[in-house]
Structures are given as C-alpha cells and as structure tokens.
Amino acid sequence: MTFEIKHRDAMGRIGILNINGKKIETPTIMPVIHPNPKKQIVSMDLINKLADVIITNSYITYKTKHLREIAEEKGIHKLIGFDKVIVTDSGSFQLGVYGDVEVEPMEIIEFQERIGVDVGTILDIPTPPDVDRERAEKELEETLKRAKASIELKEERGFKLLLNGTVQGSTYLDLRQKSAKEMAKLGFDIYPIGAVVPLMEQYRYRDVAEIIINSKMYLPTNKPVHLFGCGHPMFFALAVALGCDLFDSAAYALYAKDDRYLTERGTLHLEEIKDLKAFPCSCPVCSSYTPKELASLNKKERERLLAEHNLYVTFEEINRIKQAIRDGSLWELVEERVRCHPKLLEAYRVVRKYIDYIEKFDPVTKKSAFFYTGIESMFRPEVLRHKKRLKRLRYEKVYITTVSSSIEKPYHEHLNVVETDVDILIKDPVFGFIPYYIDTVYPLSQHEIPELFDYEKEINKRFVDEFIDWLKKKIGEDNILDIMTYNYYINYFSANKKINADALRIRKMLQYQYGFDIIDDELMNKIKVVRSKTTGRLRQVLDENGEILFSVRSNDNLLIPSEKGAKLLWKKIPFPKYRVVVNKEAEEFAREGRNVFAKFVIDCDEELRPYEEVLVVNEDDELLAYGTTILNGIELREFNYGLAVKVRGGLKINK
C-alpha cells in the first residue's frame, strides 16, 4: 500500500491511496454493501459507477453458509460483484449491537485473508460512550491485545491483506490518545476511529470532533484515517478538515427505509416535502421524479430510488469537499456546513482548543481569499499564524494607526504616506495589525471582513493590547510614537534622510516569510526592484548586477527565490531552519532540479508548514536545490512515498 498527498487545506488532504494496484482518491466514501446480493438495495452497477472502494461485513459472510462457500471458492470480489477495493468489518459492529459474536479474533482475520479481502479489520471491542472508566480501560487493553496478535499472525503467515487498526477508548480522550499511540507502534495500514456512531446518533458532534483530534495527534501522518460509521454528508466537511480521509455509509440505505431524504444540510422526511414542485437536487432520481410522484410509488421502489438519491448526494458532497481543498476554501465550506445544526457549530467551536496543532498542517498560502463568516473565523489557522509571525519583524520605531473600512487593500496603494524607517502598524479587526510594508502578503490583502459587532472586536482587542505590551518591552515605550511625535519625525526624516522604500518593503517581507533578516544594511543599498508595467506592483528583486534574487508571486505576494536568492537564504538562515535534508542517493537528482520524493528525506526543519519555500541540502548542509514543500515538518519525517518538495531549480557542480 502507498499513500501520497496531492492537494491540501486545513488538515484535509486529497491523497492517492494505492491498494493492490487499485487507486483510490481520498477523501472518499465507502458504501456499505450487504454481502448477500439479494439484500442489496442499490444495484451494483450504480455502486461500480460511483465508488472506488466499498465496505462489507466479513462476519455476516462467515456466519451465512452459502455466502461463506461462495466467498471461499470464488473470493469476496466475485460474491459482491465489485472488482475494485473491498474493505471488510470483522464483526465489531455486531459485537457492539448484540454484545457477542460467534467467532474468535484470529479466526476472522484468517477468514478475511482466505476470501481475498483487500483491507481487513481486527475484531476490536467498540466500547460505547460514557461507560465507567474501568470498563473502558479493560476493553481497550483487550483490543490492543487482539491488535498485536493480529499483526503477528499476519507477519508469521505472510498474509497479503492490509489491516485496519481501530482506535477505541470510549469518550475518554486520554484513552483515545493511548489507543492511537499503541496502534501506531504496531504499524497498521489504515487507522479507523471506532465507536462514534452512538455519538452521532445523539448529535454529540463535539465529542466526535474531540475524539478525532485526540486520535489524529498520535497517529502516523503517512497513513489514512477512517471515521467508522460516519455516513451523513453534513458532517463530512468538518471531519475532513480535522484529518479524516475515509468514511463508510450505510446511511444511504438505512435512511431510505424510513423514507428519509439526505441533503448536505440535514435530513428531510419524504412526507414533509411531497408537496414541493421539485426536489432541491438535480441527481438522476430527483430529475426524473417530483416529490409527489416518488411518494406515490410502492415501498420497495420508493426505497430503492431514495437510496440512490442518498448515495448521489453523499458522493456529491465528497466531490464538493475535494474542490474546496483544491481551491483553498475548505474552512469556508466548513463554516457554511456547521451552521446547518447548532450541535455542529458547537463541534466547530471546540476546534479552537486545538488550533495550534491544526495550524501546523494548514498551508501558508491558498488560491482563495480568507472570508470571515462569523466569530469562529477569528480563530482560524491563518489568523493565528499571522499573529505569531508579527513577532518575526525587526522593529525600531513603530506608529500604530487605524484606517477607514472604505480604504481598499493593499493599503499602501491607497494611503498618502511618507515612507520612512518607521513601522506603521494598521489595526485590523481580525488580524490584529497589518504592517504597512508587508500589506500585500497573503492573507493581509486577500481577505474580506464585514463590519463586526462590538463583542467580536473585543476578542481582537485583547491581542492588540498584548502585542503592544510585547512591543514596549522589545523596543521601549518611547519608540512607539504618538501622532505628534510621528508627524515631527517624518518631517525631520524627509528633510534629512533618504530611504529605499522598495528595499525596506522587501526586507520586511522576507523577515515575515522566513523569520530572519535576509536583506541586511549593506544589501539594502544594492538591491533594485522591477515593477509590473500594467499594475505598478513589485514583480522582481534584483542584486547590484541586475540578476534576479526573488520573484514576487502575484496571487499571494510571497517572495520566490531564484538560484541566487536561494544561496542568499542558505547563507543567512542557520541550519536546520527552512531545510529539507536528503540522503546521498538523491543528491544528484536534486542538483539536476528534479523533484524530491519523501523516501529520500532524512531530516528537516520540524517547524515547516505546507507550501513553504525551502532549501534542499545534504547531510553536510550543502545547498542542492530549492523549491516548495508539499509536506510539513512532521510529515516530511514520516512519509516514505510521494512528492515531498516540488523543486524549482538545482545547483549543479561546476566542473
């Protein structure tokens, strides 16, 4: 099995999961298929059309004589009528519902291997929510014991099937953490998070969100995570943003039995909407029937068609989430979805407790602008990261001001400011401060914020006050200028000094982007800039010989180094910061400007964020290449497959 990340936003990722030569693009949904074809509501033709992976129950197959005989003779794929990836549950669901199963833990592993399952599951114990701690601990220990035995059996017997190692622990977050840590040590292929269905049935989405995060924090980043039993599309966006890659759904069929109609915003009963002229959906079912026509059909036909609609809308939401990841707008989609139900909003609000961890996985730049959709946006990773990176700038004199909300961004293009060596900090209702000299950098000019209520402003005011206190300690209170002192200073400055404002802007932008003073006082007098002939905006940074050091990327205004710029960064930034270290095998390829793959990475700056500009070096810190990291500092050390750094250029050895 291999797994690689192609696109990402929040903790969500579009990945390619390769199982036995069959490719699955994640995130995705696994429709639950009954192993008895006669009991399957939706035709396998439609399942084959929509799904790359399904999940079925090996325990039912095992306990049903004629199904077991067919599966053992012809294989599970022939029994189901599905040639792509088949995942099986082991009977844990039945164990949770009925309290007992008539199969031994190792026996069901052997059976899953025997019938040709692609991904099997250990017979874990799904501890329900809110049980007493003693029971939760005891059942977790038994699950871990079975997990270890299952891995040992697989290795000893040379089984081909991949294995799910399910994270348990009831509603005790420390037990979920323990379970994740211990499962991770055993080296499972996929990590489901189990026993959350009762919580979702009770709309306890906050508990589910906390369980996901507390499990994810201790699971390996290079393996997919499956949220067992999550089948309602309105929860997918949040779950993906928290790092879930796989879902399974029996909801499409179960809801249809009760005449329930799934939407991405909730569930409707057919009886409630039968008087509508048309369905709020354009799937083949909803395009062919009116609500009244569908309601008038016999029970069996109505159930089949409703199940088909439910399946279509489920996959539609998955596709919508993937597009949001590609666009860099997943947080906006999440904030739209969580307003579908108060309990979902409650779940989203608990995420702020873990935002320091989530920020590590959130890309530093995105295609889409930051849209403020409610007070929850105040705590998003983009805001947290900016507030931290404000302290990267080198301040000497500071003037703090406000501007009218009618002033367009970037501010420096629309304000009549005498440019001096004073750092002008413009108060912002969400981002705290926007420094005048870096106001083009993402997301400082790429955001939209409505007029805020006073209680929203109060949250930001706390940060503003804390940052001013930090400034006073850093540069001294006398160097935070009031308006009279500032006006006097700029008049004096204009008469007595000259400043290369473009060079100062580049210097500040590099400080913000890298955290180090790349352009020192000597270089300040040597660098030149090239501006766009159409927009007048900065496009290139040149050295004294007219050679390009950096290009200013138009969509986010990050500074992208040339070979000479990369050498400057390497000289100014101490090891291991902004480094990705590769082994000797990859040195020649990196120097030739070829992409760096994860299996060649042996070390890195652990603080790297996705899509940052990085330096590729060898173990002796010799600069080999430069480019954009796809993975963060944690993932670079854990992934062993797929693209790690998209290289822009290599440094060939002069012979």
UniProtKB/Swiss-Prot annotation:
GO terms for molecular function: pentosyltransferase activity; RNA binding; zinc ion binding. Belongs to the archaeosine tRNA-ribosyltransferase family. Its cofactor is Zn(2+). It comes from Methanocaldococcus jannaschii (strain ATCC 43067 / DSM 2661 / JAL-1 / JCM 10045 / NBRC 100440). This is tRNA-guanine(15) transglycosylase. The keyword Secreted does not apply. GO terms for biological process: tRNA wobble guanine modification. Binds 1 zinc ion per subunit. It catalyses: guanosine(15) in tRNA + 7-cyano-7-deazaguanine = 7-cyano-7-carbaguanosine(15) in tRNA + guanine. Zn(2+) binds at residues 281, 283, 286. Its EC number is 2.4.2.48. The active site is at residue 89. Pfam families: PUA (PF01472), TGT (PF01702), TGT_C2 (PF14810). Pathway: tRNA modification; archaeosine-tRNA biosynthesis. Substrate binds at residues 124, 195. Keywords: Glycosyltransferase, Metal-binding, Transferase, tRNA processing, Zinc. Residues 577-652 form the PUA domain.
